[in-house]
Amino acid sequence: MTRGKPDRKATKKNSAPSFSRRKLWCFRLMAMVGMPLVFFSLVELAFRTLGFGYPTAFLLHSSNHGEKTFVQNNQFGWRFFGPHLARSPNPISISQEKPSDTIRIFVFGESAAYGDPQPRFGLPRMLEAMLALRHPEKRFEVINAAMTGINSHVILPLSRDCAEAHGDVWVIYMGNNEVIGPFGAGTVFGSQTTPLP
């Protein structure tokens, strides 16, 4: 090797592309997050294509004598409590296209709003009867979207699903189950608090 000439092997080695530490960590992070995300997305797509699982929306699209309707999903509570503990919502069948002469009212809440143990005599039914008596010239549609044993973390997705039905008024009567309900601090599902001394 002479003094004035550069070494060709060393030049080739130095000119090869090198990843910086930042690019390497970005690649690793994308692989750690991206690969599982792609995998689970494909599994979810396969399950939906094959018909596994159950619908999770509160209102399901249906039809009655050619008219498009919304009906209740009796499996809605399964994702929060499982099939053995979940309660079913009150039967619902309403037109997807709200009639122009109708005022559609949704009642959200827990067992008190639902009318447990007899929903026929609960808040939604009383509200419907009082409105019909007070305003006989108007048509009211009061939908009992309350369920027994739920609290705000269940009412939020339930109300988002009901937004598709274009309600005019939402009545919210809740709060009892936030502490003593299924996920409150005072039950077996919630964190157990120690009694005060």
Regions found by a protein language model. Name each.
Residues 28-46:
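Hydrophobic membrane-insertion alpha-helices, especially the h-region
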Residues 50-135:
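Membrane/wall-proximal cationic-aromatic binding patches
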Residues 104-107, 141-146, 169-174:
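Structural recognition of the beta-strand scaffold that forms the well-ordered cores
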